């Protein structure tokens, strides 16, 4: 039952409910008019009678999402990058704007307002949950529709669970998601591929791009290859290489949260006190594991590259730090995906014709 009590010029609705631990709790809600109090009284009595009563909660969006995140990571055995990406969405694109709002006070128009705000927000405005000062040039590059779609998907999935957990009666996330932005990518013709490779003087970049073009590899997959993945005798001497690992650099805090079953190796830190780790992990799915036929040109380049690795190690075997990877720096350390990206962007700047 719910009771109405007049308090000065306002009316209070008092009712008793059981919290999630089965403890009996009294709650008072104040209204300026008797009509509003009566309406709320009937609503409470109906919800209590039908078992649809929502236990009052002051939990905020930030508190809920930071509780939801590790639970989902553990349940679905997320890869480090998946956890890190979702954490970044929460810290940088959700909490700064609606993090302090109480979950039960959130309405669809709040979410729509968030999407509108984000559509005008510069990329990198927040990093690690902290606001950054951006240059005028940086402020012109706003978040893409694809990023907004990712925020929507995270809110949609997490708030459905908030309903299951009894925090919400209904999710406030709108049904319609922000539209993804699609960007057409030009695909090189065979002659363009050859011309591009011919213009690459950096041997590491040349091999990385050559492997990428032949096998449609991601940067992490290229960096994750080892000499053992190369088989020159396979396919009647044509040669193949196998893709079944990916290299990533992730936050050490992330590694503490994720299931380590997919992690094959954690590389030693280059710098003392580093907050990130370079890891080698399984590829995303079984479909991502594949064996790729070499072209004659790639086969020859790989043979020369492996000979080069032997020569570099023989120059100073005591100081050579053999990472065991196919792509290595002259000192034997692994070539990270970000280095491949930097080398490619530098080449791109020097060759705008491609």
What are these regions (language model features)?
Residues 57-163, 323-326, 341, 345:
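Short, Lys/Arg-enriched alpha-helical recognition elements, typified by the DNA-recognition helix
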Residues 124-132, 136-151, 164-225, 235-238, ...:
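Basic, Lys/Arg- and aromatic-enriched nucleic-acid-binding interface segment
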Residues 66, 105-108, 120, 169, ...:
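Phosphate-coordinating loops and pocket residues in cytosolic domains that bind phosphorylated ligands
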Residues 2-58, 77, 283-285:
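Short, surface-exposed polybasic/aromatic micro-patch for ligand or macromolecular engagement
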Residues 160-169, 304-307:
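Arg/Lys-rich amphipathic alpha helix in sigma70-family domain 2
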Residues 123-124, 198, 202-205, 215, ...:
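Short, basic (Lys/Arg/His-rich) helix/loop patches that form interaction surfaces
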Residues 12-14, 177, 192, 225-311, ...:
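Conserved tyrosine-mediated DNA breakage-rejoining catalytic core shared by Y-recombinases
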Residues 94, 111, 155-158, 166, ...:
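Conserved hydrophobic/aromatic pocket- or pore-lining residues that grip, position, or stack substrates
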């Amino acid at each position: 039952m719910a009771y109405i009590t007049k308090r000065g010029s306002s009316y209070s609705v008092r009712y008793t409910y059981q919290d999630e631990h089965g403890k009996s709790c009294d709650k008072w809600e104040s209204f300026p008019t008797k009509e509003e109090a009566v309406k709320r009284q009937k609503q409470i009595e109906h919800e209590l009678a039908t078992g649809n009563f929502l236990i009052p909660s002051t939990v905020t969006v930030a508190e809920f999402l930071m509780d939801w995140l590790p639970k989902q990571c553990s349940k679905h055995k997320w890869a480090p990058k998946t956890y890190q990406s979702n954490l970044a969405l929460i810290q940088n694109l959700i909490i700064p704007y609606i993090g302090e709002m109480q979950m039960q006070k959130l309405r669809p128009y709040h979410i729509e307002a968030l999407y509108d705000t984000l559509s005008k927000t510069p990329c990198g405005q927040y990093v690690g949950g902290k606001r950054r000062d951006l240059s005028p040039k940086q402020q012109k590059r706003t978040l893409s529709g694809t990023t907004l779609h990712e925020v929507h998907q995270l809110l949609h999935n997490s708030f459905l669970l908030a309903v299951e957990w009894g925090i919400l009666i209904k999710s406030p996330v709108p049904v319609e998601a922000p539209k993804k932005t699609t960007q057409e990518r030009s695909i090189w013709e065979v002659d363009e591929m050859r011309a591009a490779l011919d213009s690459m003087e950096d041997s590491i970049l040349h091999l990385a791009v050559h492997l990428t073009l032949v096998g449609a590899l991601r940067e992490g997959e290229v960096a994750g290859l080892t000499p053992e993945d190369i088989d020159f005798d396979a396919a009647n001497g044509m040669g193949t290489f196998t893709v079944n690992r990916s290299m990533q650099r992730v936050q050490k805090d992330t590694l503490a949260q994720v299931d380590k079953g997919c992690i094959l190796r954690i590389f030693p830190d280059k710098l003392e006190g580093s907050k990130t780790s370079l890891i080698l992990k399984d590829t995303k799915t079984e479909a991502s594991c594949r064996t790729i036929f070499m072209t004659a040109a790639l086969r020859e380049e790989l043979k020369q590259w492996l000979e080069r690795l032997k020569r570099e190690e023989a120059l100073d075997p005591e100081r050579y730090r053999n990472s065991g990877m196919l792509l290595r720096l002259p000192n034997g350390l692994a070539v990270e995906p970000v280095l491949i990206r930097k080398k490619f962007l530098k080449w791109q700047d020097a060759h705008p014709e491609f």
